[in-house]
Amino acid sequence: MANQGGPSRKSLSFSGHSFQGRKKASENEGGGGGGSDLLPRRSLTSSRSSISLSGERSGERTVKRLRLCKALTVPDSTTLFEACRRMAARRVDALLLTDSNALLCGILTDRDIATKVIAKQLNLEETPVSKVMTKNPVFVLSDTIAVEALQKMVQGKFRHLPVVENGEVIALLDIAKCLYDAIARMERSVEKGKAIAAAVEGVEKNWGTSIAGPNTFMETLRERIFKPSLSTIIPENTKVLKVGLDETVLGVTMKMVEYQSSAAMVMVENKLVGILTSKDILMRVISQNLPQETTTVEKVMTPNPESATVDMAIVEALHIMHNGKFLHLPVLDKDGDVVAVIDVIHITHAAVTTAGSTAGINNETANSMMQKFWDSAMALSPNEDGDETRSEEESMKLSSEIEVTKSFSYPNTFAFKLQDKKGRMHRFMCETQSLTTLITAILQRMGDDIEPDNLPQIMYEDEDNDKVVLASDNDLGAAVEHAKSIGWKGLKLHLDYTEERGHRRGLSSEDMDYDQSNSWAAAYKTVAAGAALAAGLGVLVYLKRNSN
């Protein structure tokens, strides 16, 4: 989705400088003039005074620590055929273009190929990609606060965002991957919502600490976790592109332009039998060198696609899309007719818009809730859950291709593994600066195993097979540093539920219990916030719907 009717993807100059997202920075580069873009013409950087261009801000996750993809980059003089071939070979749906000075000058997406190339019958082998690319794409600096960048992408309704560091494009941010991560964690949080709420109450009772604080929104969620249906976010009179099996790919792309859509529903006697998307056209038509004038939809469509019903819960629809790893989901009415086609960005944008305009919820509160949502979704390290980021060894080396690989390190993260009560081993990456963060990661995997009235002691196994207590942030930091010093790449954790626990020398039982109580309380609060925001979007949609 290059644009989807949102703000045009113009370059955004860095606030306070004439800086344009480029492969290499130039001293004389300009960020461009004004214009009627809905977004200001500047890079997506934080407006906060605490911004640092040289490093990451303390306590806030930055774009650099999101799930980034390597950027496939080619010269803008490359032919469309070669560009499409490389995109198909790498199985990516976005390509960055550079000018003769190796400066970033454009972006090309699968939707551009369908609507600007195939629909207009351009000669793939003779037309340079510069003729159809979106010029001067929006970019984001690597040290931009991640929450702000993601919310800007949702508001702008575009998926792909080049990431710039020290004037060079280092990666590409695909919001769909970030949203799928959030969806997976939302799903886990929603399933554990009641257990988390009970755990919060239990910890408050045992430790005499108020975790949630004066939060009316949280109290509302405890009383009623409402999951609205897809019908609440589908606009009236939605136009759906429907085609037949015998229509040609060329004809369908022309209709995509007319409907401003990147997906066509394939129908037989008003029944859905397939779906054809712009990515299908790239991967199955152009890459196979099939003639779009004569190739029929039936030959290249995805048959019998997953679908949803108008009364399906939003969370369930997101779960289907996450499991299937696809972007478009047809929505059917009770008669089986397709009434809409949704995607993750559509759903998230609708939820955010509704949250921001709900009666009784001011913009500051709505923005705060959305920030908590993103913060919760990003609470774990980006390499968790089967990181899809490719390694350098997996890179496809193509001649004359400029390829930017992801080579980020995460100096404040470390690998951990932990066995649950069912004998299953959990492996994950986690920040090491705070014991609360580690406990949060444990709760998100083993929350059902842990009773708030019998909180375990966290221990790790050292090189002598001794179990050593982790009672504070300093303990955690020391354990990780020691593990690194002896060449270990991870720590094995244990949860000790016995009444008589070993303690570190120099730390009293009272001090340790105090530190532990604070860490467990803060961790439960973090996990509860994730459940709250996942369900909270549903509550806000419900409140808005009933206030009209």
UniProtKB/Swiss-Prot annotation:
Region described as Disordered: 1-58
A Pfam short name: PB1
Keywords for the protein's UniProt record, in alphabetical order: CBS domain, Membrane, Phosphoprotein, Repeat, Transmembrane, Transmembrane helix
PB1 domain ranges (all copies): 411-498
A cellular component annotation (GO) from this entry: membrane
Membrane topology of the entry: Single-pass membrane protein
Record InterPro entries: AMPK_gamma/SDS23_families (IPR050511), CBS_dom (IPR000644), CBS_dom_sf (IPR046342), PB1-like (IPR053793), PB1_dom (IPR000270)
TM helices/strands, residue ranges: 521-543
Regions of compositional bias (Polar residues) in chain numbering: 1-18
The protein's name in its UniProt record: CBS domain-containing protein CBSCBSPB4
Low complexity: compositionally biased ranges: 37-56
Sites bearing Phosphoserine, chain numbering: 18
Entry keyword Transmembrane: yes
